Amino acid sequence: MIKVYLAGSMFCEADRMYNALLAEKIRERVGEHIDLYVPQENLSINDKTKCANSHDIFWGDYNRLQNTDIFIARIDGDIPPSGTSAEVGIMSQRRQYWNKGLQDYCRREVADYVTLSSSELEENYIRMNGREPVILGLCTDSRNPKRTYLEAKNELMKNEDYESQYCYFNLFTLGCIKVNGELATSIDELVDKLEVLVNERK
């Protein structure tokens, strides 16, 4: 089973409903091939009517992250959720370790005069260690400058104070997502990208 982790803000009713909708659409499309973890569904550590224990929350989610194949980071909102940003960092580091492990493995095999191509060596490494973890980001903010009229907005910002039309994102968090995967701007686009990744890993 391909392990998928859905991260994002979950503290207000709107967020929980959105997460539930997203999880439903994911399960409808690829549910038979994945084990989807949605933190808000894990009431053993995320029942907010009870006293939260930071150790239990950290280890509960961290242990899931260590076995996650595809990590989905929902980063909508004025500021990407701090917990989600931390998890993006953990997944980015896991991917870097995976890539370093592949490089070390290929280097050792070449040193031992193994006559395999680089693609064959990578296939062997994947058989032993699984595929590299991937991050999929989801941001549906309508202020995406890629799809708006830049010239008119730039003119307004040039002549008026505090008229920035753009949403701000922490570029470190955004970079972690883009370097280690892809960013989707709608639920449908996200589910399409996820389906491609799942089909590659089945």
Residue ranges and their predicted role:
Residues 1-202:
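Conserved catalytic or regulatory cores that recognize and/or transform ribose-phosphate-containing ligands
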